Regions:
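Intrinsically disordered or compositionally simple regulatory linkers and C-terminal tails
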Residues: 1-9, 574-584
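The feature marks cytosolic C-terminal regulatory regions of anion transporters and related permeases
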Residues: 388-558, 583
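Generic hydrophobic alpha-helical segments
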Residues: 179, 488-492, 570, 574
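Active-site-adjacent beta-strand anchor residues
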Residues: 145, 539-540, 564
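Alpha-helical elements of the RecA-like P-loop NTPase motor core of helicases
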Residues: 233, 371, 547-548, 572
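Transmembrane helical cores of multi-pass ion-transport proteins
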Residues: 1-454, 468, 522, 554
């Protein structure tokens, strides 16, 4: 009966809030409260802007920034991760939902809610079954390339709001063509508002805080005011539109935003909708998880804390389900907000819950004031935010380090820009998996020899070493499994056919952590064929777990040679000269 009752440690592992709440005190409350104020100030305009990017009503951005933050505070393990709407996921949402319904319709909003629910379920299932390791198969350079291209697409897609024109498109060519075709319809007042806001926000990022500090202002207050730059832009441009009736001059505004707390919403369970959204939900889940965990791990390392990736899946899954049930759309951990949260002094996930309270108050009290907010201001907020995502230096870095990685990154960027975000992210995931399979299917194999005067064996192409014509010593620098077993077979056969004096082949297995069934069958075949050539097969430096598995098969009994503890032992046994020299 006791086995059915989880221990306190097990409960705390699945409910991290029970861990950090035990040491919560007034000082921690103060730190979390200050961080929440700063992040709330930053999140209000961002949530409105990202809803615009997703093609959704502004209030859905606010809704996606309330209950999801509370859910993450309960289930998440990062002390500083700030969950909410983010640019890339908003773009992916627009791409997925835009194929099913027209923007501004109830069907479009319902599809976005359903997408959040599906993403949450996928993340939860991955967390329950501890599938977080699957994210390791995604190449970070490839994902960086996708995010860079997405940043370019996002910024380009918002130019229509800066110019005050109509423009459509799912890729860079379509967007630019549509923009150029409608430039004659540019609204000059909108353009002035948009450009001025972009310039102001870029200056706020780098110049406002130093300027405030130069006046003698306290660093903490200067930091808060600098983070409030986007809010200042919202206030000033909204007042300008209201005072001068600029909406009557063609400046497009947000319009009526319903006030109140998020309503309880129910996602669609229509099988047709689920089948259409499944791939998008899966990709959003994976991309969101990879970026979220990357940010969380980086920030946790700075305070010598740790996160649990599988529990992060649960936390993000709960956040997305909470978003769906409260009228929001897919969310994940935001890089910029998380860094701000960390720098502002957040000590626990409670900072996120306090931020949710701030957003809820904004949804209750401030939404009537957003009626005259220009869409150009929100577009400027998005453009400035996503420019930090654009990093084309990944191309030069991969070119210098690995041409294969460069080709994958370039293909991902190119296809994302030319074909759109859905093709781009699918390509990125596929290329990541192909890169992994390509690299592991062609493991590095080095022929090794004895370094004179030592017991060390090194690559004959890199060091001056001693070898023996009767012995072919090979070091395998990869685990052996179905994808690379044939490569090893071909390598050995090519060498022994070309080098007739060989009587012994020694496989140095110091880097082999695993041998699967396919690789075992290949070793058995190598052993059999070499025996037919009068050549003995030996193993050296086999790790314990690998040896345990080999012992459960008939391979060791059929092995024509021996298993040596070290490569030096093999050299002593197989080359009498080494034993006579007694090198050490």
């Amino acid at each position: 009966m006791n086995r059915l009752i989880p221990s306190r440690a097990q409960v705390e592992r699945h409910l991290p809030i029970l861990q950090w709440s035990k040491t919560y005190n007034r000082a921690t409350l103060t730190s979390d409260g200050v961080a929440a104020i700063i992040v709330t100030i930053m999140l209000i305009p961002q949530s409105l802007a990202y809803a615009l990017l997703a093609g959704l009503p502004a209030q859905m951005g606010l809704y996606a920034s309330i209950l999801p933050l509370v859910a993450y505070a309960i289930f998440g393990t990062s002390r500083a991760l700030a969950v909410g709407p983010v640019a890339v996921v908003s773009l992916m949402t627009a791409a997925a939902v835009g194929n099913m319904a027209l923007q501004g319709t109830a069907e479009y909003a319902l599809a976005a809610v359903t997408l959040a629910f599906m993403s949450g379920v996928i993340l939860l299932v991955m967390g329950v079954f501890r599938l977080g390791f699957l994210a390791n198969f995604l190449s970070h350079p490839v994902i960086a390339g996708f995010i860079t291209a997405s940043g370019v697409l996002i910024a380009t897609s918002q130019l229509k709001h800066i110019f005050g024109i109509e423009a459509q498109g799912h890729n860079l060519i379509q967007l630019l063509s549509s923009l150029v075709g409608h430039l004659a319809q540019t609204n000059i007042i909108t353009l002035v508002i948009g450009v001025a806001t972009v310039v102001f926000l870029f200056w706020v990022r780098k110049g406002l805080k130093p300027a405030l500090l130069a006046t003698g202002m306290a660093p903490r207050l200067a930091d808060i005011l600098a983070k409030a730059g986007p809010v200042g832009a919202v206030v000033v441009t909204t007042l300008a539109v209201w005072l001068f009736n600029l909406d009557e001059a063609g400046v497009k505004i947000v319009g009526a935003v319903p006030s109140g707390l998020p309503p309880l919403t129910v996602p669609s369970f229509d099988p047709d909708i689920w089948s259409q959204l499944f791939v998008a939900a899966l990709l959003i889940s994976v991309i969101g998880f990879v970026e979220s965990v990357s940010v969380a791990q980086t920030l946790a390392a700075k305070k010598r804390q740790r996160i649990v990736p599988d529990q992060e899946l649960v936390g993000l899954g709960a956040s997305n389900i909470a978003a769906a049930l409260s009228g929001g759309y897919p969310v994940t951990g935001g890089f910029a907000r998380s860094v701000v949260n960390f720098d502002a002094g957040a000590e626990t996930p409670a900072a996120g819950a306090f931020t949710a309270i701030g957003i809820a108050l904004a949804a209750l009290l401030l939404t009537p004031l957003l009626f005259f907010l220009p869409k150009a201001t929100l577009a400027a907020t998005i453009i400035v935010a996503v420019m930090s995502l654009v990093d084309f230096s990944i191309l030069t870095k991969t070119w210098a380090y690995s041409k294969v990685d460069f080709a994958a990154v370039f293909a991902t960027i190119f296809l994302t820009l030319i074909s759109g975000v859905e093709v781009g992210v699918s390509t990125g995931v596929a290329l990541s998996i192909l890169l992994f399979l390509y690299k592991t299917s062609r493991p590095h194999i080095a022929e090794v020899g004895l370094v004179p005067g030592t017991q060390h064996f090194r690559n004959i192409k890199r060091h001056t070493v001693e070898t023996h014509p009767d012995v072919l010593a090979i070091r395998i620098d990869e685990s052996l499994y179905f994808a690379n077993a044939r490569f090893l077979e071909d390598y050995i056969y090519d060498r022994v056919v070309c080098d007739q004096p060989i009587k012994h082949v020694v496989l140095m297995c110091s880097a082999v952590n695993e041998i699967d069934m396919s690789a075992l069958e290949s070793l058995e075949e190598i052993n059999h064929r070499l025996n037919g050539m009068g050549i003995a097969l030996h193993l050296s430096e086999v790790k314990g777990p690998v040896m345990d598995k080999l012992a459960r098969s008939p391979f060791l009994k059929e092995l024509t040679g021996q298993v040596f503890l070290s490569q030096y032992d093999a050299a002593v046994a197989l080359t009498p000269k080494t034993a006579a020299d007694g090198t050490a």
